[in-house]
A protein has these predicted regions:
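Structured catalytic cores of enzymes that bind and process phosphorylated ligands/cofactors
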Residues: 21, 39-43, 71-93, 115, ...
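Active-site Asp-x-Gly
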Residues: 102-114, 149-153, 160-215
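Residue-level signal for well-ordered alpha-helical scaffold segments within enzymatic catalytic domains
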Residues: 28, 74, 112, 120-123, ...
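An alpha-helical support segment within catalytic cores of ATP-dependent transferases
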Residues: 80-153
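ATP-binding pocket architecture of kinase catalytic cores
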Residues: 3-111
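Short strand-connecting beta-turns/loops that link adjacent beta-strands
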Residues: 47, 167-169, 219
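Short, low-complexity, intrinsically disordered N-terminal peptides in bacterial proteins
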Residues: 1-7, 246-249
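A conserved long alpha-helix in the C-terminal portion of kinase-like catalytic domains
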Residues: 24, 36-41, 123-140, 178-179, ...
């Protein structure tokens, strides 16, 4: 469990080097942010421990959510060198929850997403053969399509618990930062019901058809949860795969 003082939060992750990966991710995100206060400040970090500035207490609001959406869009626009690229100064994998994941730069988003994010977790999760076949068919459909998207600088694990609303507005914590599709962060926010989600999307300027594509961007976190949290995520993963196939025609 994180240790909290009046001004800081100290974490010692179980995974070796996870603290360093998180610290480099936070610094990279802060460098790309329009307002550095949108990203938790790293006070100090080592291979085993990370200390961040504690987020001052606050409550979400519609206006704060719209501002957070705008800041997220600006962060994404700051870009990344490639899909899957880790933050500068970090060559290793990153971590989503307790799960380690590959970060090998590639020019093709679909290849990166399918081969480094969805299938590695889906194939290890305890889902049925029929469910795995459905996920693989969804991945084949993703890979078969040409995607007009440039690498964005993304948080990579932006569920509601990693977008805090303090007294100064929205603040992101605990990233799995890498170069990715910008809507990946939107899909994660939608997965577990972020407060004022509609306002976040409004501030972000999300496309009108974003709901159609949300399930595709949830394949990765649902596959991770099916592996790390068990069978309660099997059906949601199955539904997301089916919705992805429907969206891709």
């Amino acid at each position: 469990m994180p240790q909290m003082s009046r001004d800081t939060v100290t974490k010692r992750p179980a995974q070796r080097l996870a603290a360093r990966a998180e610290a480099e991710g936070l610094r990279w995100l802060a460098d790309g942010a329009h307002e550095r206060s949108f990203v938790a400040e790293v006070v100090e970090a080592s291979d085993e421990e990370i200390v961040t500035r504690r987020v001052p207490a606050g409550r979400p609001s519609a206006e704060a959510a719209r501002t957070a959406g705008r800041e997220l869009a600006r962060l994404h626009d700051s870009g990344a060198e490639a899909f899957g690229c880790p933050p500068p100064g970090w060559d290793g994998p990153n971590y989503i929850g307790t799960a380690e994941q590959e970060c090998t730069p590639t020019d093709d988003w679909a290849e990166f997403y399918v081969e480094q994010r969805v299938l590695p977790f889906a194939e290890l999760a305890g889902i049925s053969s029929a469910q795995l076949d459905l996920v693989r068919r969804a991945c084949d459909a993703i890979a078969a399509r040409s995607w007009d998207v440039v690498p964005a600088r993304i948080h990579g694990d932006l569920w509601a618990g990693n977008l805090l609303f303090g007294s100064d507005g929205g603040i992101m914590i605990d990233p799995a930062a890498h170069g990715g599709h910008p809507h990946t962060d939107l899909g994660m926010l939608a997965l577990f019901g972020a407060p004022y989600l509609e306002e976040i999307f409004q501030g972000y300027g999300a496309p009108k058809d974003i709901e159609k594509w949300i399930p595709m961007h949830q394949l990765h976190p649902l596959a991770v949860h099916a592996l790390t949290h068990g069978a309660s995520y099997n059906r949601p993963l199955e539904r997301a795969a089916a919705a992805t196939l429907e969206a891709l025609g």
